[in-house]
């Protein structure tokens, strides 16, 4: 049990998270990301990540 007032602070939000979610919702992009990584897969489908 961890007291929510103690412990590590919340991690910084990932600036790429919205793009990661877009890629995850596209089955082809999501599959490609499993092989070559999210940023490269996103770039191939949508342009610059």
From Swiss-Prot:
One of its GO terms (molecular function) is hydroxyapatite binding. Disulfide bonds join 23-29. It is found in: Secreted. GO terms for biological process: biomineral tissue development; bone development; brain development; cellular response to insulin stimulus; cognition; glucose homeostasis; learning or memory; negative regulation of bone development. One of its GO terms (cellular component) is extracellular region. PROSITE patterns: GLA_1, GLA_2. The keyword rRNA-binding does not apply. Keywords: Biomineralization, Calcium, Disulfide bond, Gamma-carboxyglutamic acid, Hormone, Hydroxylation, Metal-binding, Secreted. The modification Hydroxyproline is found at residue 9. Ca(2+) 2 binds at residues 21, 24. Ca(2+) 3 binds at residues 24, 30. Ca(2+) 1 binds at residue 17. InterPro entries: GLA-like_dom_SF, GLA_domain, Osteocalcin, Osteocalcin/MGP. Gamma-carboxyglutamate residues are formed by vitamin K dependent carboxylation by GGCX. These residues are essential for the binding of calcium. Decarboxylation promotes the hormone activity. Its main location: secreted. The modification 4-carboxyglutamate is found at residues 17, 21, 24. Residues 1-47 form the Gla domain. PANTHER family: OSTEOCALCIN. The carboxylated form is one of the main organic components of the bone matrix, which constitutes 1-2% of the total bone protein. It acts as a negative regulator of bone formation and is required to limit bone formation without impairing bone resorption or mineralization. The carboxylated form binds strongly to apatite and calcium. The uncarboxylated form acts as a hormone secreted by osteoblasts, which regulates different cellular processes, such as energy metabolism, male fertility and brain development. Regulates of energy metabolism by acting as a hormone favoring pancreatic beta-cell proliferation, insulin secretion and sensitivity and energy expenditure. Belongs to the osteocalcin/matrix Gla protein family. This is Osteocalcin.
């Amino acid at each position: 049990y961890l007291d929510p007032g103690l412990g590590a602070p919340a991690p910084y939000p990932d600036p790429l998270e919205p793009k990661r979610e877009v890629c995850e919702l596209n089955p082809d992009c999501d599959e490609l990301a499993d092989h070559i990584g999210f940023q490269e897969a996103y770039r191939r489908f949508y342009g610059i990540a």
